[in-house]
Amino acid sequence: MAARSVRLAQLLLFTLLCGFVGLSAAKHLDLDGIHHHQHHLHSATTHHRRRLQRDSRAKDAVGGSTHQCDAVKSYFESIDIKSSGTYSEKGAICGGNCCNNATELELRDKAAGMFEQLLHHHTSSLRGVLETNAKQFQSHVLELAQISENMTHSLFSKVYTRMVPSSRMMIHQLYTEIMNHLIYTSNYTNSNGQLGRRGIGSVQSNLEEAVRHFFVQLFPVAYHQMVHLSKNNLGDLHEDYVNCLQHNFDEMHPFGDIPQQVQSNLGKSVHMSNVFMNALLQAAEVLSEADALYGEQLTDTCKLHLLKMHYCPNCNGHHSSSRSETKLCYGYCKNVMRGCSAEYAGLLDSPWSGVVDSLNNLVTTHILSDTGIINVIKHLQTYFSEAIMAAMHNGPELEKKVKKTCGTPSLTPYSSGEPDARPPPHKNNVKWATDPDPGMVLFLSTIDKSKEFYTTIVDNFCDEQQHSRDDHSCWSGDRFGDYTQLLINPGTDSQRYNPEVPFNAKAQTGKLNELVDKLFKIRKSIGAAAPSNSIQATHDIQNDMGEGSGGGEGQIGDDEEEYGGAHGSGDGSGDGPHTPIEESEGTTTNEVESRDSGKTSGSNPLEGTATWMLLTLVTMLFSSCS
């Protein structure tokens, strides 16, 4: 009985425990349900309140956008862009309510047109400088030649009066020949190899022959009127005697070395003048041909960023009349403009710089030197006078040579009457034209500034516009803020890492390579005409040709990683380097889920203790029962 009573008591205790545990579990489940229901009601209320706030803000934004877009609409109409104000469809590029996709397409074309116009303007200006200087230089040396002829006639009429009737025509013929060789329109060889009446290579030899012919003709006149003087020296020399003197001109050497000096100096200086004018015109042609290619070199990426730079602020409701609202980031502007011009600038920059260096050397060492065309023309009448004086000084020796070779002079009556010993009336002293040195100095200054023309052709735009130099609080392509991308230097190698418009190494550059070859030929023609600098010029040209047409696009070496910081995504957002959000170490989805379930099962420590006590009692009960 005692054992039975014990078992009965144990059974009752077990029943009571089970009931207690059941009640506790039921109570716990009811509390969880209440908490879950209350959480659901709170979430629904919060979601409803947020939706009302969002709808209210959207309503306010629509009203504000409508007002802003109305202001932008008038600006668009002023630049011939049709706009209906606010669009329900936002443009894919700018993302503003004031432009749809069609508007953005129009604005993109207009931005590209503005860029081309900028290039046309600067190219046309430089081309005009080259063409104008070629014409002004030609005009000046022709004027000098005409004045020199007048001064020579005046000299003969004052000093060598008896020679005037016979020498007037030969002097005029010589100067006519000189001026014909200085007219570049007849000597010009364009960059396509098409010749005028003569190529400049024949100018020097033809002119030297004309100078020699002048002195050969002058010899009988100078000998008869200034050397072989006598009372019976009346009349003209017989034609046969004149022919004898002219035929033996080289052996008699009447004027010393002066004819050879004039031949050399005049021939070389006129040749250099033609080379100079020819180079100016060919360089202007290259600029003109490059000007026609600008539009073909604009990539879609370039056009996209030109749109973002010029008009996306307007599409987002910022009126262009307010400079503070549309102020561009200086670094962003430079990167876009340099990236858009990198293809032709990278190819043409070095060859163009070489041409400018050669032109500078040609002007300073040949055109403006003591043996340059200006000084040579100014001293022609002095050369002629010195030649006659040399013949007179060596008169006795010269007469011996003449009598030995041609005999005693044979005379004929004057064909046009006896020459008047009195000097003919002449105009007031002839003055030289304005010295061209100031104009040439200005030209040299201008052409020297154009040495990096293709590198800096677009920088002027960013320098002239209203920009934020420190790249703070400005338009960075997608928003107003700070522009944190690196400003990439000009040059093909650097522009590969342009964060906005990266250099396109696969672009078609066939026509540009043709222009590179033309620039090399211009520099080579200048170098060939200036042999004193031929070694250095040849070395420089060979170096340039290694970078010019036909060359590869180059290899990126181990320093590619060094430029990694500059190699941005190209989105132009100006947000700076992107730091990806990484998950905490050791944190996975599964672990997040297990932690959530742990919160439910172990949120109350008393429940864990009761469960442990219950399991202990049940174990004891089953042990007793067994």
UniProtKB/Swiss-Prot annotation:
Membrane topology category: Lipid-anchor; GPI-anchor
Biased composition (Gly residues): 565-575
Compositional bias (Basic residues): 41-52
Record GO biological process: axonogenesis; cell migration; chaeta development; chaeta morphogenesis; compound eye development; dendrite morphogenesis; epithelial cell migration, open tracheal system; establishment of protein localization to extracellular region
Keyword hit for Lipoprotein: yes
Lipid-substituted positions (GPI-anchor amidated glycine): G602
Pfam family name, one: Glypican
Propeptide residue interval(s): 603-626
Localisation per UniProt entry: Cell membrane
GO cellular component term of the entry, any: external side of plasma membrane
InterPro entries (alphabetical): Glypican
Entry keywords, A to Z: Cell membrane, Glycoprotein, GPI-anchor, Heparan sulfate, Lipoprotein, Membrane, Proteoglycan, Signal
Region described as Disordered: spans on this chain: 41-65, 533-607
Described function: Cell surface proteoglycan that bears heparan sulfate. Functions as a coreceptor for growth factors and morphogens, such as the products of dpp, to regulate signaling and distribution of these ligands. Required for cell division patterning during postembryonic development of the nervous system. Plays a role in dpp/BMP signaling possibly by stabilizing dpp and thereby creating a morphological gradient during wing development. Might have a role in testis development.
Description of how the protein assembles with itself and partners: Interacts with nord; the interaction promotes dally degradation. Interacts with Magu. As part of the dally/ Magu complex, associates with fwe (isoforms ubi, LoseA and LoseB) and is unable to interact with fwe independently of Magu.
Official protein name in the record: Division abnormally delayed protein
Organism of origin: Drosophila melanogaster (Fruit fly)
Gene for this chain: dally
